[in-house]
Each structure stands twice: as C-alpha cells, then as structure tokens.
C-alpha cells in the first residue's frame, strides 16, 4: 500500500515565488520565505500617466518543499534534509537500533526509516545537545540563525510599508531587529524555545516565545472511529500550507507509530505528540494498568522517530483531583483524565510527577521540548480560573525549574474556556509562576453557546491572550466538540488563528507586523484587485467571493466592487477629491502668480 501523491497540495500560491534567505554565520542555513509579486501603481493626472513599481512583499512560509517547483517531493522518502549539519555533530551518535521495531510492521510501514541519533554519554550534562544548553554555553547554533532570519523577513528592505502604530507589549522585550545573539539569549533565559529534535532533519526550525511573532499549532490525528494514515499526512501538508507553525499528532487509533513516522518524515514544521495516548494503547486502553516502564519506552521510541515536543501531564497530582469534583464539566483533558484515573485507582502520586527527573534525562538526550500539559484546564467558562486549574499551574512552575536544571526547553500549556474578563489573569499568573516560560493556549473559548462556530468563539480569546503574552495558539476548528476535523475544517481553523495571531502581533508592536496590512491597503486604494487577492491570508477565498458577483476579467481592474457600485465607491470618490484638490491648488497658485505680475522672483517687503 502507498499514499496517493496526487492528493497532496503542491501548487504554489498565486503570484508567489519561493525564496531562501542564506545564513551568514552558517552557509548551510536556507530560510524559506514567500515573495508575493505585486503589480505597479498607475497614476493618471491631467492626461499624464506614470507607472511606479511595487517591490515584492516577503511573508513567512511554513509549507516546506511542497510549494517549491524546483523540488520533487516524494512522501515515500520524506522531505529533503533542511538541517544537514545534524549528521556531522560530534555531540551525538547513531544508536544501534530502534526501540520499537515490531511496531513498524502493519498495513503501511514507512519504507525509508532513518537510523536514530542521541547525545553521546560524554556530551550530557553541561555539554549537552539541547538548544538551551548550547545557549547557556554562549553558543549560537544554526537553528538560532535560522529563526532570527525567519523572524526578520528582511523587513529593513521594505521601508515604504514600514509605518506602524505603536504597540502595547505588556512587558515583552521586542527588538527592532532579530539577531542570532538575541535568539540565543532568549533561549538561554527559558523565555523562548526552538523545538528541534536531532532526529527530525527535515525540520525548518521555528521559535516560540512572547518576544517573537505569535505562532499557531494545528492538531490532527487518527481516532479509533475514523480517519487513516493517508488522510492525516494529507492534512499535515494542508495545515502547513495555510500557515501552521507546528502540528500535533494526536492519533489514538491503531498503528499510531506508523502514522507518526509518515507525518514526521514529511513535516517541515515541529511535530508534537501526547505520549500517554500511545502508552494507553499498549495496555489495551486500561488507564490503571499504565506503568512507568511502558511510558518510558514510549517516550524513547517517539524521541527516536523525531518528535520535537511532548505534551506531558506531570502537573496532575493526586491532591488536585478532588478540586475538580464541583466543576460543571469535570476534567476535560484526555491526558488529564487518564492520569487522574490512574492516581485514584492506585491512590498514588502521578508517576509522571515522581519520575519527572528521569523524563528530563530522556528529553535532553534527543533535544525534545517539554509542553507541560494543562490536564486540569477548564472545559466550560463556569469552571474558568478555579482552584484546580491554578493548583496545577503552580506545579507546572515547579516542574519548569526542574526541566531547566536539566537543560530541557520548556513551554506551558494553558486553557481552555475563559470569559474575556478573566483572560488576563491567566497570562499574568503564568508569567509569574512559570518564570516567563512560553505560554501555549487552546483559544481560550470566550463563550460556550456556539457549537459549529468555536473557531470564532476561541479566536476572540486567542487574540486577546496572545496580545497579553501567549507565545503560541493551538487552533480550534468549527468541528470542536462535534467531531474529527476534515481538510476544510483544518483550513478554516488555521486561517482563523493566523488572523488572531497577526492581530496580536499588531497590538504588541511586533517589528514589521503591519507591512502586509499596509501593502493590501495600498492595493485596495489603488484598485489593484489581483494584488488584494494575492496578499490575503486565503487568496483563493478572496478571489472566489469577488467572482460571485463580478466574475469578468474587466472587473479585476474596475474602480468599484459590487458592494457600492461605480457611483458610490468611497475610495473612488476619495481619488476624485484628491485629484480635485490638486487641480484647485494648481489653479490657485497660477492665479497668485498672475496677480503678482507674472514675475518669477518677488521682492520681499523691507519690514
């Protein structure tokens, strides 16, 4: 059996060219960006027409090699390696074999499996391989230069679009220009993470932290009820095409290991998982039969595959479980409920908490990033900001310090369902308790009354909490609470969350954030319809909606749309007013010249 390549989206975006920004410290660094070609501005005045060029606009590109016509992608072999330096690292070594060879068999085994690497025993501790350990040693890694270039997008070359309103960053330290040294310092402090497992060479690195552009994550994965490996690979490529900065594989059905192998080998973005899901499958879905040994082996096998970050619900402690008893919706996190059940069945402390130092050692050996899970997040706005939620947050702050002591990069997961007036408290508490480790939130949803529209109810809260300081937003699709999302749901969720993240970047004053807004506003005022479509987050939808009422080619140069028509277009009227003001001004100056006798030089008065 093989995956149908024709279902994978490889068409470049309209009027767009894949470009690569080269590293100066590390020549092998090639950072992908999308250059949107813009048509020229045409000015007509008093019968004279002049054409002014508009330079291409550079925007972030998470789509990988799939949108590069120069690269022939093959899902059977995986993406080209974007980090070739990994194979030459003297601090890592190849392992003798995989820890989970038996699980590679089945209906769709991956044909080209990489030999896994891990830190050499002598390279652990202070000389370890994680981005945090390197940063603390004062080293700038290729990944650090990569993300610095990715954040900047050569904004200094787009001066015409540089106007930007001052932002309110709520204490964030946004630089005017991102340098590899700034990145190194943020990673060393724990305020940013670069999820980049040494076994994911296909990865194009990204950085997550409140002093950087707000990132978004897309969830996907098989379930016991529906979906397949083929569908999930297709959705991963689809999500990254539309702008997902990371992807989480939340597969809970059969063949979890194989599904993940196909996804990781073909993913240009960091991949996250919740290892407890696969561990539970290994004990036939019986939470009380979970053991540390089963979970440990699952961590290692996923780290060997190249998973970049793990959601680990080590903050769900035995003493916290009774705090959820009076909740309207109890424990809504799958991982949280699994571990709560284990704690109660054994009346013991959560083994992820008691074994946390050992988990850190595994993470450090492969440079896997922690995403400390919020297993007690509120599942309804009635339960928001309650004792259970904040008790777990306190434990996550404690575990963050332990992870940092082991040199492991760490981010913190957050809610959930929170009404607008309670959102800021979540951010201020997290910054304080977790020492500014990056916050990664699911929304939050600001109301519970809109099933089918929860991508909107959550985007409201997502934009707000990202403005306050959340570093990454986990998308919510229209299918939230209703079913497994399909491709269209993934697209809607990603675009909605790109809007929320961008709105937060604007509000914070992220350098260069307003350039795309300025470019599309300029195109709109100049009736450059094709440029408006091409600059949009979803060019296809923008063009399709315009075509519904004005499909003719001539309508793409018209100075009106179907909303106002030719007689009432406000922007056309603004053009007329400006032209009239210019003519009136010229006529006034001509009249003044004649009244002064037509002399080129006029003598000034003696007084």
Curated annotation (Swiss-Prot):
Record Gene3D superfamilies: 6.10.250.620, Radical SAM ThiC family, central domain
Cofactor dependence: [4Fe-4S] cluster
Positions with a binding annotation for substrate: 219, 248, 277, 313, 333-335, 374-377, 413, 440
UniProt keywords, alphabetically: 4Fe-4S, Iron, Iron-sulfur, Lyase, Metal-binding, S-adenosyl-L-methionine, Thiamine biosynthesis, Zinc
EC number of the protein: 4.1.99.17
Pathway per the UniProt entry: Cofactor biosynthesis; thiamine diphosphate biosynthesis
Entry GO terms, CC: cytosol
Entry keyword annotation includes Ubl conjugation: no
Entry binding sites for Zn(2+): 417, 481
UniProt xrefs under HAMAP family: ThiC
Sequence similarity: Belongs to the ThiC family.
Protein name: Phosphomethylpyrimidine synthase
Biological source species: Deinococcus radiodurans (strain ATCC 13939 / DSM 20539 / JCM 16871 / CCUG 27074 / LMG 4051 / NBRC 15346 / NCIMB 9279 / VKM B-1422 / R1)
């Amino acid at each position: 059996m093989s995956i149908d390549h024709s279902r994978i989206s490889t068409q470049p975006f309209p009027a767009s060219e894949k470009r690569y920004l080269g590293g100066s410290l590390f020549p092998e660094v090639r950072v992908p960006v999308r250059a949107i070609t813009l048509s020229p501005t045409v000015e007509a005045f008093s019968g004279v027409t002049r054409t002014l060029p508009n330079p291409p606009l550079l925007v972030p590109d998470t789509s990988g090699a799939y949108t590069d016509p120069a690269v022939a992608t093959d899902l059977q072999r995986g993406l080209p390696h974007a980090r070739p330096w990994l194979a030459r690292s003297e601090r890592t070594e190849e392992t003798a074999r995989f820890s989970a060879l038996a699980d590679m068999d089945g209906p769709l085994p991956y044909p080209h499996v990489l030999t896994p690497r891990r830190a050499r025993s002598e390279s652990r501790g202070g000389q370890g391989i994680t981005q945090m350990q390197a940063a603390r040693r004062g080293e700038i890694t290729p990944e650090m230069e990569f993300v610095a270039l990715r954040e900047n997008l050569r904004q200094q070359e787009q001066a015409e679009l540089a106007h930007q309103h001052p932002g309110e960053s709520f204490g964030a330290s946004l630089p005017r220009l991102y340098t590899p040294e700034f990145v190194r310092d943020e990673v060393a402090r724990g305020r940013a993470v670069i999820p980049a497992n040494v076994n994911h060479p296909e990865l194009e690195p990204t950085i997550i932290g409140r002093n950087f552009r707000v990132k978004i994550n897309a969830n996907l994965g098989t379930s016991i009820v529906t979906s397949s490996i083929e569908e999930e690979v297709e959705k991963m490529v689809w999500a990254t095409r539309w702008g997902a900065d990371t992807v989480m594989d939340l597969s809970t059905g059969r063949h979890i290991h194989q599904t993940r192998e196909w996804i990781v080998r073909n993913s240009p973005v960091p991949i996250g998982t919740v290892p407890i899901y696969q561990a539970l499958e290994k004990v036939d879905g019986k939470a009380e039969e979970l053991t540390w040994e089963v979970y440990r082996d699952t961590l290692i096998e996923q780290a060997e595959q190249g998973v970049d970050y793990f959601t680990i619900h080590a903050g769900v402690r035995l003493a916290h479980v009774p705090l959820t008893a009076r909740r309207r919706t109890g424990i809504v996190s799958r991982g949280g409920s699994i571990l709560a059940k284990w704690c109660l069945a054994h009346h013991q402390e959560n083994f992820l908490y008691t074994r946390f130092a050992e988990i850190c050692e595994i993470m450090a050996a492969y440079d896997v990033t922690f995403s400390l899970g919020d297993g007690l997040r509120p599942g309804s706005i009635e339960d928001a900001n309650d004792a259970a939620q904040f008790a777990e947050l306190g434990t996550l702050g404690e575990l963050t310090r332990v992870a940092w002591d082991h040199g492991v990069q760490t981010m913190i997961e957050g809610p959930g369902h929170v009404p607008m007036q309670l959102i800021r408290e979540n951010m201020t508490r997290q910054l304080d308790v977790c020492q500014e480790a990056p916050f990664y939130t699911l929304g939050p949803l600001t109301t519970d009354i809109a099933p089918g529209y929860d991508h909107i109810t959550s985007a409201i809260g997502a934009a707000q909490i990202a403005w306050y300081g959340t570093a990454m937003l986990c998308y919510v699709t229209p299918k939230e609470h209703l079913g497994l999302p399909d491709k269209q749901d993934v697209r809607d969720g990603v675009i909605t969350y790109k809007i929320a993240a961008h709105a937060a970047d604007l509000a914070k004053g992220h350098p260069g954030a307003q350039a795309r807004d300025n470019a599309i506003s300029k195109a709109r005022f100049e009736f450059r319809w094709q440029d408006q479509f091409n600059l949009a987050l979803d060019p296809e939808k923008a063009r399709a909606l315009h075509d519904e009422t004005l499909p003719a080619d001539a309508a793409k140069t018209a100075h009106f749309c179907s909303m106002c028509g030719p007689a009432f277009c406000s922007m056309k009227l603004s053009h007329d007013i400006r032209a009239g003001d210019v003519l009136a001004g010229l006529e006034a100056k001509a009249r003044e010249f004649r009244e002064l006798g037509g002399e080129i030089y006029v003598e000034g008065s003696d007084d």
